[in-house]
Amino acid sequence: MGLAVGVVVLAVVLSAVFILPKAVSEFYYNPNEAAGQYEEMTTTRMDLDLSVYSELFLPGNHRDQVSAVSRGYGEYDIVIPQTSSWTGKFTSVSGRLVRGKLTLYDNNVLSRPIMQFYLPGDEDAWAAWEVDENGKETKMDTEARKEASIQDSKETIADYNDNDWYLAYVSLNDIMDYKDFIEWFQNLSNQKELEWGALWCAVHTEDEDGYCVEPNIGFCPLPSGMSVSWDREKYPYLSLLDNSDLSHVAEANDEETMQTHFTSMLSYIQDHDDILSMMGQTTDSPNRYQDMINFVQKNGLKIHGFAVSAKKKALLELYKEDVVSYIQTTPQN
């Protein structure tokens, strides 16, 4: 009798130690799930999720590799390395994923930038009010405030170190077709022999009422990072670096491919929104990404701004261009 009880107890203990942790994990987000496979190379779910998310929302800070060590019961130790850098500095981010909730030990590294694009014709973006000693509010001269902000930006850039890298958010005076934009950017680069880092295009989309859906969303037309695998039939050109076709790299001026790439990323993030909540974004608008897809498919790629890694010389040259409206900058990570 005692032996039988002992066997049962041992079975329960072994189950709790070896089976239960894995069984519980099956109910929650698994960062190590295979999202794609090519030969011996596996792309994990969180590799792909973070690659798409960071390209859409984190200009100059693309991440496409995640190390996830399972602790059982839906818990994982997470490390997100930085695999490319224009400054020579590499910043990895560590954290813990507990049953679908991600806690990063340094939230600032992968947080969405506080900088923004100023949309052409949106004068409300420059609106501000002054309050006198009696509490009376007076609207400031919008155009004067805009000009003062531009002058402050130019003076800030003029004081920069010549050899340091900066991430610039560049607003355009007019919304441009992607074909015209990339042609202008490439010509500027060639004529001025400017040194650029990663280019990121801010795509303009509108909802049915004509309002911009999301000003700070876009894509990188010049691929960099790790080649990945995924469901290519469902999400064509989800990545511009394909494990199965490393010999072919899409050209930046291939507008059709770039449009497919961008809309595939929107479709993917719409279908795999776990990464949005993990990164602290709300998902309370079910039609948000579909509205963007519909607009791009109907109107093509429209660009209202771009982000780029650059040095002082290139930033000063940008301000000489008629298409450029305003530049916000921050030191490059």
Where are these regions (language model features)?
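Short extracytoplasmic/periplasmic juxtamembrane "stem" segments immediately C-terminal to an N-terminal membrane anchor
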Residues: 30-49
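Short amphipathic alpha-helices in soluble, non-transmembrane regions
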Residues: 182-190, 318-323
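Short, compositionally biased low-complexity segments enriched in polar/charged residues
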Residues: 105-162
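Acidic, glycine-rich flexible loop segments
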Residues: 284-303
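Low-complexity, serine/threonine/proline-enriched polar segments
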Residues: 94, 100-101, 201-281
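Short acidic amphipathic segments
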Residues: 309, 315-330
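Extracytoplasmic/periplasmic/luminal assembly and interaction segments
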Residues: 51-114
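Hydrophobic membrane-insertion alpha-helices, especially the h-region
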Residues: 3-19
